[in-house]
Amino acid sequence: DSRSLTCELGSGPVFVAMCGANHDSHAFVAQMYARGVRAFMVERPLEALPECGYVVVENAIAALQCLAAYHRAQFRGTVVGITGSNGKTVIKEWIAEELPAGMKCYRSPKSYNSQLGVPLSVLMLEGDEELAIFEAGISKPGEMERLERIIRPDVVVFTSIGDAHQENFLNLEQKCDEKMVLAHRAETIVYHSYYEPLGRMIASRFAGRKLCDAASCPEVPETLIGNEASRRNARIVEAFCAAMGYPAPSFTEAPEVAMRLEVKDGINDSVLINDAYNLDLNSLALALDYLHNVALSRRRTLVLSDIAQSGLTDDELYGRVAGMVARAGVDTLVGIGPKLKRYAALFGCDREFYASTDECIARIGRRAVAGRAVLLKGAREYRFEKLAHALARKSHTTVLEVDLDAMIHNLNYFRA
């Protein structure tokens, strides 16, 4: 994104200049060069720039997709593709939460499921993950074939089928056909036969594959998850875990996906960015990028928990975190957890540390919050939603009750 250049970018960023019906990103090449970018993928030759390299391609998005497909081909872990009309992100996050302890998993950030979002998310794979989960979304025929070549999923999870983007398809069967392209090479397919005609079409077309129908999984009690659609999603997650040989999900609660990069007014004239659902290096980089865009002239506070299951040594992990924090221009780091405190010397900004989220809520200073843009970025087990509630500006509802009978009585009294 040419508007921000704050996330961790490895040995050097590449700016991909794309042309669309109403935009031409080549207009930002000079700006990106001035900000230190020295590698470009463009659709037409550039004017000579010192110490600059560029590749000219016919179509930048298509070239990016080819690059992502090559990167995916080097990956040796298991790849999961999730598609459907609704519930892709919810099920992705839910699956990630229910994985066995210690498993290193990558999942695509936010809802990166488009022709551009999928290659970007695939290129974020570090390569040593055991499991990678990607969303694939389409809006018209022909799109899924390109996404399938990039993702090449070993396992495909189908969510619900509904009317989203139906205007571009002749009927629901054609839409199901298009979505099923994602399973072209998949060995395992998870679906819910409640959603027709998808269930019937999958059972017919992929009869020779390993099929896991969520309808055969035990019902999730309404006392645990009240919403019917969420209970169906839960059974899809249960079917996935069974297909993979993982322990059965706990289903203590449905994932609160709205907690991702949610902006709210905070106490003491602050702005809160709540990204308290999960934490890894990729999602931290994206969240810091978002903080840069939201903060504008405000000072920046990052409230961060310890990071688990990164696959890196603590020295390497927190060294990288410190570099990301410095490049993002964070003014104050509020660290929660013993490991961040142990590596306090790596951070050059103002900093304060707490052993737990509850201690942070009780003791965090006004100076770290007042008038600032505050990013809350925590692992699920740290329950940062409690911190978000404590730091959010409270609004109260006032109810005005009017007794019309009494008003008429009073009016008649004074008329008399």
Residue ranges and their predicted role:
Residues 63-188, 197-205, 366-367, 385, ...:
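Phosphate-binding loop of NTP-binding sites
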Residues 288, 322, 404, 408-415:
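Generic structural signal for well-ordered alpha-helices
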Residues 256-259, 274-286:
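Glycine-rich phosphate/pyrophosphate-binding beta-alpha loops
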Residues 20-22, 46, 138-141, 162-164, ...:
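Short glycine-rich anion-binding loops that position phosphate/pyrophosphate groups of nucleotides
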